[in-house]
């Protein structure tokens, strides 16, 4: 009899997965964690979170090695992108990285998984 590999099981409406398939967060660089942020006016960016400060102008985030996500394809939401990355990188438009980027009025900060961060770093630089 062939053995079946079970990746998930549902019991009373709750889906369970093997312990070893838990989400692994991306590694820090110099103690800084990789994040995906969404701001009110400056769009979506990802990079290493250097600082967060709450000011009268809103939350100000400083990212290191930051890239702006001008357009993405292959993820239904930023939540999916932060967990899985994008599955159509050839259609994405990500800027070249900048060493330091201070972004004002950040409304969402999402930690990146290891899989997502490695995936996003591989998206080609979009320039005109």
Where would I find each of the regions flagged by the language model?
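Conserved RNA-binding domains used in RNP assembly and mRNA/RNA metabolism
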Residues: 5-11, 17-128
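Nucleic-acid-binding small beta-barrel platforms of the OB/S1 family
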Residues: 1-2
């Amino acid at each position: 009899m062939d053995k079946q590999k079970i990746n998930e099981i549902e019991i009373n409406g709750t889906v369970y997965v093997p312990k070893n398939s838990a989400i692994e967060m991306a590694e820090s660089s110099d103690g800084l964690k990789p994040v995906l942020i969404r701001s009110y006016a400056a769009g979506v960016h990802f990079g290493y979170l250097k600082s967060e400060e709450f000011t009268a102008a809103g939350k100000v985030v400083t990212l290191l090695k930051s890239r702006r996500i001008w357009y993405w394809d292959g993820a239904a939401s930023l939540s999916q992108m932060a967990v899985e990355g994008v599955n159509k990188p050839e259609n994405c438009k990500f800027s070249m990285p900048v060493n330091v980027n201070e972004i004002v009025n950040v409304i969402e900060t999402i930690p990146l998984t290891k899989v997502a961060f490695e995936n996003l770093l591989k998206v080609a630089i979009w320039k005109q």
